[in-house]
Design a protein with these regions (language model features):
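Bacterial N-terminal signal peptides that target proteins for export
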Residues: 2-13
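Bacterial N-terminal signal peptides
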Residues: 12-22
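Sec/Tat signal peptide C-region and signal peptidase I cleavage site
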Residues: 24-27
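Extracytoplasmic soluble-region selector
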Residues: 29-321
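Feature marking well-ordered beta-strand scaffolds used for ligand recognition
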Residues: 235, 239-242, 282, 293-678
C-alpha cells in the first residue's frame, strides 16, 4: 500500500477560522486531552496516511490508517490528532487516538481531511481551539453509486415550431437515490423536426413527431416521444406595469400571444430578451418580469415565429447606502461571543443576552442591560458546563429563556432553562440532557414548544415547555430516519411552518400547525424541500412569500457564502428567485423586520438590505443595500483588533444589536427610515 507523507505546518488564525467556524461547529465536539497526551503532541512533526488519496463511495464506510512521527521518524505514542472532514465525509470531526478512524462517504465530490495535533494549552490558542496546532491535509474524493435509470420530466409548454424548451430529467442510482453528479446528454431522432442541444434545449422546426433520447456517461438511456405542433401565433402585445423604475425594482409585463382569429395562445413559451439602449445590466425572466442592476434605457422583446413585440423601460438609480452610526460597544476581549437575544424584561428594562464560543472557554451567557442603548452595562452572567453556549432564546412572555450547551466536560449537554423573574440576574430553573447529550446547537421557541437542533442525531427534538421548570420530550422529526449522511444546523418557525436548515440537503419545510399537510406542533409533516449545489445551508428566515437562506462556506481566503432568496408562495414548490452576494465575505445569521434584511456577514460586518417588493436577481448588484457597519474593535477591545467577525443581528426598538465573535456586543443605528418600494 502506498504511503503518503505530509509535513505539518502551522496554520494561521484566519485559515483556522475558516475551518472552525463552519456549521459543523467542530469546536463544540472537541475532546478533553490529558496533559500527557498534549505533551506527546509537541513531538509530532509528520503524519503518514496509508493512501495518497482517500476515495470512498456515497454511504460507504472505510477505515483510514494514519501514523504520527517525530522529527527523527519515530512513531509517537499517546498523542491525539483531530481529523476534520471538509466536504463529503462524515463525521465532521474524528479523534485519532489509535491507528485508524472510520469515515463514511456523504456528499459526492471533492474535499479534504485536515489534521491537527493537540498540544499544551500554554502553547497558544488558535481561533477557539486552545492548544491546537500543526496541520496536514489529505485529498478526498467521494463517488456516487452507479447510474441505473433516468426519469424524464414533462415539458413545461407545448412544443410549437419556432419555440425552444428545456428538456430535463433525473438520474437515479442503483440504490434508488438521486444521482448527485451524473449529467445527461440529449439527441433527436429527426433534427429536421426538432433539434436538441447536448444540454437539452429542444427547438421545434417542423410539425411532426420525434424521439428524444437521454443518456448518461455509463450508457443508461431513456426516450421521450415529442410531437411538434405548427405555431399558431400571429401577433403579440406586451405592456409593462410601469415605463420607469429604479434598479432592483421588478417590472411585470402583461404579454399576450394571439392566433389568426385573435384568440389567446396560453401554452406557448415565448422568447424573451432584453437589450440595453443606454445600460448593460438588465434581465428578463421566463415569467415575464424585468429587473435592472444598472441605470439606463432597456428594450424588452417578446417573440415567437413571425410575431414580436417590444417595450422600453427607463431605469434610474436607487438611493445609495447611508451612514450606519455607532451607538455603543460592549467589548469582550476574554472570550468569543456567539448569538444574542434582545428583549424587554418583566421589570420594564431592556436586556441583551449573549452566548459564548470556545475561545476563552465558553461556559457563560452574559447579561447586558441596554435600556439606555448608548451605554450597555454588563450586569451579570450565567455559568454552565459547556465550552460552547451557541444559542440563547427568550420566551414570548419573557418569563424564561433557553441556552444551549455543547462540549460539556461531563458529555451531558442539552439545554438549560433560565428563570427570568429577575432578568438582570437570571437563575437556572431546569436542565434537560436526556436524549440531548450529543449537544444542542440552536433552538427556536414557538409558544410552549421548543424546537431543538440535536448535534448527536441531526434530528429536531420537540420539547414541551408548558411547565418551564419541568421540560418534557414531546416529539422528534428528522430527514431520512436511520441515515447518517445529513446535518441539521438550525430551525426557525412561524405561522404554522418550520424551516429547517439541513446543510447539504438545503431547506426543509414542515407543517407544524398550518394545517396544509396535517401537521401539528408536536407531529410535524413534511411539506417540501429545496437544495442547491454548494450546500452549506446554515440559516433560514421567512418574510412574506420569501425565505432567506444563508450559506456558511469556509475557504482559504476566509468565510464565503451568501443569501439565497427562495419564493415559497407555492409552499409545495419552493424556487430560488434572487440572491444577495457580498463578494468579499460570508453570511452568518439573519434577521428580517419591516421588509429590511439584517445580515451578520462575518468579516463584512453587519449589512442592511431592502427586501421590499418583488425580488429577482442579485440584490447586492442592484444597489438594494441600505447601509453597513464593520464591527472592528480597537486594540484591547476584543480578541482580535481591527477585524470584523459579525455573528448575529437583531433589530430592537429602533436600534440594531450585533454580536461579534471576536469583540462582543455592538449597538448601531441606521440613519434613515426604511424606503418604500412600490
Amino acid at each position: 500500500m502506498t504511503r503518503f507523507m505530509t509535513r505539518f505546518g502551522t496554520m494561521g488564525a484566519a485559515a483556522l477560522a475558516v475551518l472552525l467556524t463552519s456549521a459543523v461547529d467542530a469546536t463544540a465536539q472537541m475532546p478533553t486531552a490529558t496533559p500527557e497526551q498534549r505533551t506527546a503532541g509537541t513531538q509530532v512533526t509528520e503524519i503518514r496516511f496509508a493512501t495518497e488519496e482517500l476515495v470512498v463511495r456515497r454511504d460507504e464506510t472505510v477505515t483510514l490508517e494514519a501514523t504520527l512521527f517525530d522529527a527523527e521518524g519515530n512513531p509517537v505514542e499517546g498523542a491525539i490528532a483531530l481529523i476534520f472532514a471538509r466536504g463529503g465525509l462524515s463525521p465532521s470531526l474524528s479523534i485519532l487516538s489509535g491507528p485508524s478512524i472510520e469515515l463514511t462517504g456523504q456528499q459526492p465530490g471533492s474535499g479534504s481531511l485536515i489534521a491537527a495535533i493537540m498540544v499544551p494549552e500554554s502553547d497558544g490558542s488558535m481561533f477557539g481551539l486552545a492548544g491546537v496546532r500543526q496541520l496536514a491535509t489529505l485529498p478526498v474524493t467521494v463517488l456516487d453509486h452507479p447510474a441505473a435509470s433516468i426519469e424524464l420530466d414533462d415539458l413545461s409548454h407545448t412544443p410549437y415550431t419556432g419555440t425552444s424548451l428545456q428538456m430535463s430529467g433525473t438520474v437515479m442510482t442503483d440504490r434508488g437515490a438521486k444521482h448527485t453528479t451524473a449529467s445527461i446528454s440529449w439527441r433527436s431522432s429527426d433534427p429536421s423536426v426538432a433539434a436538441v442541444t447536448g444540454s437539452g434545449i429542444l427547438t421545434g422546426l417542423a410539425a411532426g413527431t420525434v424521439t428524444v433520447s437521454a443518456s448518461t456517461e455509463n450508457g443508461i438511456t431513456a426516450d421521450a416521444t415529442i410531437s411538434v405542433v405548427e405555431n399558431p401565433v400571429r401577433s403579440i402585445s406586451m405592456t409593462p406595469g410601469t415605463a420607469s423604475t429604479r434598479t432592483g425594482d421588478v417590472v411585470e409585463f402583461d404579454i399576450v400571444a394571439r392566433d389568426v382569429e385573435g384568440r389567446a395562445v396560453t401554452d406557448i413559451a415565448l422568447d424573451l430578451a432584453v437589450s440595453g439602449l443606454e445600460g448593460n445590466g438588465g434581465f428578463v425572466f421566463d415569467d415575464g418580469t424585468f429587473v435592472a442592476e444598472e441605470t439606463g434605457a432597456y428594450r424588452v422583446l417578446a417573440s415567437t415565429g413571425p410575431a414580436s413585440a417590444a417595450a422600453i423601460v427607463e431605469v434610474s438609480a436607487r438611493q445609495g447606502p447611508v451612514a450606519v452610526e455607532l451607538v455603543a460597544h460592549g467589548p469582550r476581549a476574554d472570550v468569543a461571543t456567539s448569538d444574542l437575544w434582545v428583549f424587554e424584561g418583566r421589570d420594564g428594562e431592556d436586556y441583551a443576552y449573549t452566548g459564548t464560543h470556545a475561545q476563552g472557554g465558553g461556559q457563560r451567557m452574559f447579561v447586558w442591560r441596554v435600556t439606555d442603548p448608548t451605554n450597555p452595562v454588563l450586569v451579570d452572567s450565567v455559568v454552565v458546563d459547556a465550552r460552547v453556549v451557541n444559542d440563547v432564546k427568550v420566551s414570548d412572555d419573557a418569563s424564561w429563556a433557553i441556552i444551549t450547551r455543547e462540549n460539556a466536560s461531563t458529555r451531558r449537554n442539552g439545554i438549560v432553562v433560565l428563570d427570568l423573574e429577575d432578568p438582570a440576574h437570571p437563575t437556572v430553573m431546569a436542565e434537560m440532557t436526556d436524549g440531548l447529550t450529543g449537544g444542542i446547537h440552536n433552538v427556536w421557541i414557538m409558544g410552549d414548544i421548543v424546537y431543538a437542533v440535536n448535534d448527536g442525531t441531526n434530528a429536531m427534538n420537540i420539547i414541551d415547555m408548558s411547565d418551564p421548570a419541568n421540560p418534557q420530550h414531546a416529539g422528534r422529526w428528522e430527514l431520512r430516519p436511520g441515515e447518517t449522511n445529513k446535518s441539521l444546523h438550525d430551525v426557525w418557525a412561524e405561522n404554522g411552518y418550520a424551516y429547517l436548515s439541513y446543510w447539504d440537503d438545503g431547506l426543509v419545510i414542515l407543517d407544524v400547525g398550518a394545517g396544509s399537510h396535517g401537521g401539528t406542533p408536536t407531529e410535524p409533516q413534511f411539506v417540501s424541500s429545496i437544495s442547491y449545489p454548494q450546500g452549506n445551508t446554515h440559516v433560514a428566515w421567512r418574510n412574506r412569500d420569501y425565505v432567506f437562506l444563508g450559506d456558511e462556506i469556509g475557504t482559504a481566503d476566509g468565510m464565503r457564502g451568501f443569501i439565497h432568496v427562495i419564493d415559497v408562495s407555492d409552499v409545495e414548490n419552493p424556487r430560488e428567485v434572487a440572491k444577495y452576494d457580498l463578494p468579499e465575505a460570508g453570511a452568518h445569521n439573519v434577521w428580517v423586520e419591516d421588509d429590511v434584511l439584517y445580515i451578520a456577514y462575518y468579516q463584512g460586518g453587519v449589512r442592511i438590505v431592502d427586501v421590499s417588493g418583488t425580488l429577482r436577481g442579485d440584490l447586492y448588484r442592484q444597489g438594494r443595500e441600505l447601509g453597513f457597519f464593520r464591527t472592528r474593535a480597537a486594540e484591547g477591545q476584543g480578541l482580535q483588533a481591527n477585524s470584523a467577525n459579525a455573528w448575529g443581528a437583531q433589530l430592537f426598538k429602533g436600534h440594531l444589536f450585533v454580536s461579534d465573535m471576536t469583540s462582543g456586543l455592538w449597538v448601531v443605528k441606521h440613519a434613515q427610515p426604511r424606503p418604500i418600494t412600490f
